[in-house]
Amino acid sequence: MAMLPKFFLVLLCLGLCSCSQKTTTIEGEQMTIFYRIVLGTSLSAKEKASLSQQIDRCFHKIDSIYNNWNPYSELSIINRAPADVPITLSVELSEFLDQVDTLYKLSEGRFDPTVGPLKTLWLLHLKSQTLPPKDVWEQHYKDMGWQHLEFQSNTKTLIKKNPHVQIDLCGVVKGYAVDCLNEICNTFCPNNYVEWGGEIKTSGHHPSGRPWRIFSEAAGTILDIDDMAIATSGNHIQKWCVEGKIYTHILDTRTGKPLELSSYPIQSVSVVHPSCAYADAIATVLMTFDSKIEAKQWAEEHHILTYINDGASS
């Protein structure tokens, strides 16, 4: 679950608040990714210890179920399973894959959580300033695809129709974790802010009484984010020049190749939505459109609030 660079500046300004504005801040690192939680109240030592324990349990659940980098996670066990054998899923993973299936269908396959091995292959070569052999990446491309999985939400089972297909939920699980953490925080204080790896969700308002404010580079301005989540995808940092072309870390599932800047002009996308998991996935989906106009039209058709920066058009 490697951290992707995000383009947010959170304007909490807590250090400038008056002494009457009590807050509780908990921050740390989980799975190599920094997290920060701010509550608009001063918790007692007992309450803070309880909150910290629940936060740890949330991250443990994420690691033990959804983390494909953990060889003992439920997801890793599924990835090692043979084809054509029904796999019984936990309630948590089954419900999550139901959301994933919805996102896959909504995006018409642009969001596909089986792209992981192909992406790893491309990044390994791009970081070495080379391109993978065509026959190698094309074989990886044939092995990926949500269509190679038979998921039954009613029976909570999954069957791999292709033994090589792998599930990688990195493109959505950070947002899901933020949703879970936000639910926990709401039981302690209705005004809170949660961030993990650049994915953000807020409830209520800032301790000063104003809205929570976040600067989004995709929007080019400060946004008021109350009782909503915001996620951003962008190509500013993770890109490589190979054989005269600039490639990014995002793959187009329609071609099996990473986005090449001359063909994909969108630089960053922010999505605002009640679900951080949803915003997380859709932000990446919108990066794969051929133009800002097309991406904006698709988002509007699906009633999704987005901010898209292509460095040119308004």
From Swiss-Prot:
Q: Which residues bind FAD?
A: M31, W69, R110, F111, D112, D168, K174, L251
Q: Respond yes or no to whether keyword Membrane is given for this record.
A: yes
Give the positions of lipid attachment, kind N-palmitoyl cysteine: C19
Tell me its cofactors: Mg(2+)
Superkingdom as given in the UniProt entry: Bacteria
What's its job? Flavin transferase that catalyzes the transfer of the FMN moiety of FAD and its covalent binding to the hydroxyl group of a threonine residue in a target flavoprotein such as NqrB and NqrC, two subunits of the NQR complex.
Q: What top-tier enzyme class does this entry carry?
A: transferase
The EC code for this enzyme is 2.7.1.180
Signal sequence bounds: 1-18
**Annotated gene:** apbE
Location in the cell reads: Cell inner membrane
- Reaction catalysed by this enzyme: L-threonyl-[protein] + FAD = FMN-L-threonyl-[protein] + AMP + H(+)
Its taxonomic placement starts with: Bacteria, Pseudomonadati, Chlamydiota, Chlamydiia, Chlamydiales
InterPro entries cross-referenced by the UniProt entry: ApbE (IPR024932), ApbE-like_sf (IPR003374)
Give this protein's Gene Ontology molecular function annotations: metal ion binding; transferase activity
- Keyword field: Cell inner membrane, Cell membrane, FAD, Flavoprotein, Lipoprotein, Magnesium, Membrane, Metal-binding, Palmitate, Signal, Transferase
Family annotation (Gene3D superfamilies): ApbE-like domains
Name used for this protein in its record = FAD:protein FMN transferase
Location (main, coarse): membrane
Q: How does it sit in the membrane?
A: Lipid-anchor
Coiled coil start-end: none
The residues that hold Mg(2+) are: G171, D280, T284
Q: Which organism is it from?
A: Chlamydia pneumoniae (Chlamydophila pneumoniae)
Which Pfam families does the UniProt entry name for this protein? ApbE
Q: Which family does it belong to?
A: Belongs to the ApbE family.
Lipid anchor (S-diacylglycerol cysteine) at which residues? C19
- Give the CC-aspect GO terms: plasma membrane
